Swiss-Prot record:
NCBIfam families assigned to the protein according to its UniProt record, in alphabetical order: hscB, PRK05014.1
Gene3D superfamilies for this protein: DnaJ domain (1.10.287.110), HscB, C-terminal domain (1.20.1280.20)
Protein name in the entry: Co-chaperone protein HscB
Residue stretches making up the J domain: 2-74
Similarity comment: Belongs to the HscB family.
UniProt keyword terms in alphabetical order: Chaperone
A Pfam cross-reference name: DnaJ
Subunit and interaction comment: Interacts with HscA and stimulates its ATPase activity. Interacts with IscU.
Example of a GO MF term: ATPase activator activity
Annotated source species: Yersinia pestis
Job description of the protein: Co-chaperone involved in the maturation of iron-sulfur cluster-containing proteins. Seems to help targeting proteins to be folded toward HscA.
Amino acid sequence: MDYFTLFGLPARYLIDGNQLTTRYQELQRQFHPDRFATQPERERLASMQQAATINDAYQTLKHPLKRAEYMLSLQGFDLGNEQHTMRDTAFLMEQLELREELDAIERKPDAETLLAEFSRRVAQMTTTRTQQMVEQLDAQLWVQAADTVRKLRFLDKLQQQVEQLEERLFDDFA
């Protein structure tokens, strides 16, 4: 059973987060290992496995990028373990330039202001790519969606680096 079916959700990218959380809580109550404490070992193990599956499914569907990767995995794309080389050289060059720009920001006197603007740009790029990915997933353009997810991974990593720099700048200021 796929994760969408487990939670009674349609297998699409845009899902109802409240419905996901409500169903997660219901399933957690239903399969909580404590409810099976007095049952035979086989049933206890089955409930623990089911609870673990429910947790994995919830974490996957709750996180937008993981949800997209999971949808693609249902179509045979294993993005989690791939060693796929990005062929979009323009995108790769843009990423190199962005990382160089981020590295340079740290050494500037107005780093906080520059970093805030940089972060807004990365957020806008992420929003644009996410909209593109949603359209591709809805249209079942799996190859294109997989490529867009790979690009979103780059942007996600870049955003994490922005946050790390924000923390360093804040620590230096404090």
